[in-house]
Amino acid sequence: MKLAYFDCPAGISGDMCLGALVDAGVPADYLIAQLAKLPMHDEYRLHFERVVKNGVAATKARVPLGERAGHTHRHLPEIRALLETASLPPRAAEWSVRVFVALAHAEALVHNTTPERVHFHEVGATDALVDVVGTCLGLDYLNIEALHCSALPVGGGLVHAAHGVMPVPTPAVVRLWESRRVPVYSNRIHRELVTPTGAAIACALAASFGEMPSMAVLRVGLGAGDMDLPIPNILRLWLGEATEPLLAARARTVTDVHAHAHHDHSHEEVVACLETQTDDLNPQISGYLFERLLAAGAADVFTVPVGMKKSRPGTLMTVLCAPHLLSTCEEILLRETTTLGVRRHFQVRSVLERHHEPVETIFGTVRIKVGSRDQQVLNAQPEFEDCRRLSEQTGQPLKLVQQVALATWHQRRPTQSERQN
């Protein structure tokens, strides 16, 4: 299992990623040849050079632009079409689209519009395309199966952007961090350390943020940024082989699922799955066990009747929990049941953005749980406990309270044409 880790003490930007990849062994000629497949080769030049930052040598990617580049501002549909028709390696093309979709959603939230309507200056700019696509080409060339990223420095101060002077971190970067709950910190350097392009690359491609995963180090590439800072303005790209089987399994799952991810407020998350079956457990203990596991933080617990050896009827119990709770839940299963072993593996589940919308019905207030993706509502259901409480208070059938609550919610929602206006 080949892992990569972005170590970002001085932040992250697209050109730093490119430089680190070339420093780690990706041939510059390969990147230049692949990028030439994009119908924009007359808008830029790409070259790499060795520089020294605070006494540390690193590789700097430079993308000087031609005159035509200054007049080109692409929208998301144009970028998607450009990438999907360029005959790039499939993974690199798919990852590139994912990065731009992530950034489009962040910009849309900032400007109160839709991702397709975002007028990109930074994102549609030629150098951003070179940085993003080049980074994805490099990761694909190195056959990276899982990418991880360190916590990111927030920076500070002000920066001039297409919409005027902005505080650092810029609004789009903040939205990207929100989408992945990225751990951030202050290193007391008040400059723009994380660019929108760098944040989008990390948030769209990294399986996790935080400490470096356990790996046998193969190579470390150093990519330099533009500014001179109190510390070396360098991104370190660590390449290695995973050394823990459980970690490797988890990383592989994250990589596979991220290849089909939708990067909006919906997300995909790794869950630990524990399973055990018994044929001699007192049924009274099962209810108590459910309570113990849920109180410990398990996301779900369920049982299924199964046929076991010697034709005995038994029960298969499955526990879903966050990976960091695996040991806790496993300990409860081993202590409280009659099992002699517990199976465990990692799975990935897609999770819709979820929020509650209260509605006033003729019976009282009911919260509607709404699930959405890409700003489109996919599911809506009344909260059971609210409906049960109102049913008990009013004497009305529970199913009627549920039906009225959902109908009331649908009536108050705007139509598609009203939302577009």
Curated annotation (Swiss-Prot):
One matching Pfam family: Ni_insertion
* Keyword Electron transport on entry: no
InterPro entries to which the protein is assigned, alphabetical: Ni_insertion
* Record keywords: Nickel
Question: In terms of domain of life, where is this protein from?
Answer: Bacteria
Which molecular function GO terms apply here?
lyase activity; nickel cation binding
Record keyword DNA-binding present: no
Q: Which PANTHER family match?
A: NICKEL INSERTION PROTEIN-RELATED, PYRIDINIUM-3,5-BISTHIOCARBOXYLIC ACID MONONUCLEOTIDE NICKEL INSERTION PROTEIN
Q: Which family does it belong to?
A: Belongs to the LarC family.
Question: Any idea what this protein is called?
Answer: Putative nickel insertion protein
